[in-house]
Amino acid sequence: MNPIVKSFEYGQHTVTLETGVIARQADAAVLASMGDTTVLVTVVGKKEAEAGRDFFPLTVNYQEKTYAAGKIPGGFFKREGRPSEDETLIARLIDRPIRPLFPNGFKNEVQVIITVVSVDPQIEPDIISMIGTSAALAISGIPFSGPLGAARVGYINGEYVLNPTVAQIETSQLNLVVAGTASAVLMVESEAQALPEEVMLGSVVYGHDQQQVVINAIAEFKAEAGKPMWDWTAPVQDETLVAQIKELAEAGLGDAYKIQVKQDRYAQVAVVKAATKEALLASNPNIDLREVDNLLGSLEKKVVRGRIIRGEPRIDGREPDMIRALSVLAGVLPRTHGSALFTRGETQALVTCTLGTERDAQKIDSIMGERTNRFMLHYNFPPYSVGETGMVGSPKRREIGHGKLAWRGINAVMPSAEEFPYSVRVVSEITESNGSSSMASVCGTSLALMDAGVPIKTSVAGIAMGLVKEGDDFVVLSDILGDEDHLGDMDFKVAGTRGGITALQMDIKIEGITKEIMEIALQQAYGARVHILNVMDQAIGSHRDDISDHAPRITTIKINPEKIRDVIGKGGAVIRALTEETGTTIELEDDGTVRIASSNGEATKEAIRRIEEITSEVEVGRIYNGKVIRIVDFGAFVNILPGKDGLVHISQISDERVANVSDHLELNQEVAVKVMEVDRQGRVRLSIKEAQTKEAAAE
C-alpha cells in the first residue's frame, strides 16, 4: 500500500486528503480530515449506462457513525438506523453542487458514499465531506467538471470568519455554506440574523475567494493520484430529427406557453407533443421515442427562454419583476392554536402552529452532541398539490430540505425561552404548488405564529428568484413558476424581514453568474419581499395579545432549589400525583424554576397552591391543621404539610395524663397542632395541648 497524501492549511484548520490505503476496490476513495473530524468518501460508477435511460442516476449517501464520537447507538438493536434529518440535509448539501458538474448526456449510474468515522465536536463534518467528495470524484476518472471547493462563512463583530468552529457559530450573525468551481459559485445555503443584502453578497464572494486554496490543492492531488479518464463521449444529436421536431412543434409549443393556467397549459403541451410523435411515427415507425421526448424537452426550453430574453411576457403574462396575486388569511382553523392560508398565484400553503411545553421540545442526540429544538417546522408536499396521485407517508429528502429552509428563514425572529416559554411546532401543508412552495411556507409560518400569539420580533416573507442567461444577455425573474425554475439557470430563494435577510439558498446550473447578477437578484428580491410583507401586514400586522383558549397556558413560579426534591418526591411520587390530580403538566429546573402548563386556569391555581404548600417552610409557633398518619407508644406522627410530618409526644396530647395514645387519637384523625420546635436535622416537634390553649385564648 502506497498512500498518497495532500495537506494544506484552510482557515483555522489543517485539511488532509489521503488515498491508496482504504477501500481500494472503489473507483476512488479518499480519507479526508479537517482537524480530528474525518470522513471516508467513496465513489463508484458503472462504465455502461442502461439502455433507454433518460436521466442521470446520481446517488449521494451521507452517514454518521456513532463510533466517530465514541458513542454506542441507542435502541434495541444498538446500531445505526435510517438517516437522521441532519444526515439527509448534508447529503442534499453535497448533491446539489456536484450534480451540475457532470456532463450533459452522461447517464451512467454513480454512487457517492460519505461515512463520518471520527468527529471533533467543534468541527462540523459537512465542509470536509464536500471537500472529500470533490477530491474523490476528481481522481476517479469519471467525467466531472471539477474540482469543487466548499467553505463555511461566519460573521462575527463585523468581520467574516472562514470555517468557524461550533462555538464561534453560536455567537455569529451568519452561518453560510458556499460551494463552487474556480470560476463560479454553484450553491449557497445560509441562515442569518436579518443581515443587509450587501453583507450577504460579500459573504458569498468571500467564501468563494477563500475556497480557491481547496480547488488548487485538489487539482494537485488529482495530478498525483488521479486515475485515467473514462473513454466516454457525449451522444451525438440527430440534427435532421432536431430540425423535423422544430418544424412540427415549435409554433405549437409557443402558443401553449401563452396559456396562463398551469393545468390547461400542460394539457396543451401534451397535445402538441403527441401530435409531433404521431407525425414522426408516420414517416418512421422505428423512431426512438425516448430521443424524441428529450429533443422536445430541449425545444420547449428554448421556446420559453427565448421569449424571456427577447423581453416578451413570461409564461403567465407577467413582467420580470412582477409578483403573482396574493391572498392572505389568518386564523382559518377554529381549534388550532394558530393558523394561516397563504396563496401566491397557483402556490398555496395551509400553515398551522401548535404550542407545547418544554417537554414537547425535540431532543436530538447526534455525533455532535445533544441539543434541544424548541421550534420545529415540518413541510408536507402531498401529490394532490400538483394534481397527481402518489405515495403518502414519511417525508422525502426534498420535504426535509424545504422544511429546514423555511425554518432557517423564521428562526432569527423567534423569541427566547425567557420571553416565551413554549415549544412551538409549525406544519406547512402545501395544498397547491406552482413554484416556490418553501417560500410560501415562510410567509404562512410568520402569519400562523402571529395568529397563535407567539411574540416574534417582526414579520418574515420569502421569495424565489430565477435567471435566464444567454451569452451576455440575462433577465432576473421575481416569483418564479415551477416551469421557470425547471427551464432557468438559477434558483435563488431569499427570506427575510424589512431589515435584512434571514435565509438565502442558491442553486446555479451554469457558469458565468457574476457578482453584478447576484446583486441585481438580491435587490429585486428585496422589493418583492417588502411588497409581500405589506400585504401580509394587512391581514395581521403583529402577534395576538393572548394565546388561544385551546393552548396550554404556562405559569412560571420560583421555589427554593433545595425544595425541588420535595416536589418530586420519592421515586417521583409527589409530582406524579400532582400532575394526575390537577391535570397539569409540571416542569422543574435546577435553579428552582417551576413551569405549570394547563388550558384550565383553575387547575393551574390548584397546582400552584399545592406546590407552595409542599415547599413552604414549617413556622415555629404556628398552628396547623394536620392528619394523624402513625401512632406509636410514645406519641403520634402528624402530617402538617405535603411531605412534612412532626411528632406529638404523648406528653403533648392533653393536659390530662395519657396512658394510651390510642384512647385519644386514631389514624387519619384531623387535629390542630402547634409547632414547638424544628431541630437542626429538620425534625418537627408538635403539641396538641398547646394548640388548644392558644385557640382557647384567641376565643
Swiss-Prot record:
Catalytic activity: RNA(n+1) + phosphate = RNA(n) + a ribonucleoside 5'-diphosphate
Amino-acid positions noted as binding Mg(2+) in the UniProt annotation, renumbered to this chain: 485, 491
Top EC group: transferase
GO terms classed as biological process: mRNA catabolic process; RNA processing
InterPro entries named among the record's database cross-references: ExoRNase_PH_dom1 (IPR001247), ExoRNase_PH_dom2 (IPR015847), ExoRNase_PH_dom2_sf (IPR036345), KH_dom (IPR004087), KH_dom_type_1 (IPR004088), KH_dom_type_1_sf (IPR036612), NA-bd_OB-fold (IPR012340), PNPase (IPR012162)
Sorted UniProt keywords: Cytoplasm, Magnesium, Metal-binding, Nucleotidyltransferase, RNA-binding, Transferase
Cofactor: Mg(2+)
Recorded GO CC terms: cytosol
Pfam short name (any one): KH_1
GO molecular function, one term: 3'-5'-RNA exonuclease activity
Localisation: Cytoplasm
Catalytic activity, EC: 2.7.7.8
Domain S1 motif: 621-689
Domain of life, source organism: Bacteria
Claim: Nucleotidyltransferase is one of the keywords in the record: yes
KH domain ranges (all copies): 552-611
Major location category of this protein: cytoplasm
Family membership: Belongs to the polyribonucleotide nucleotidyltransferase family.
Assembly and binders: Component of the RNA degradosome, which is a multiprotein complex involved in RNA processing and mRNA degradation.
Protein name from the UniProt record: Polyribonucleotide nucleotidyltransferase
Biological source species: Shewanella sp. (strain W3-18-1)
Gene of this entry: pnp
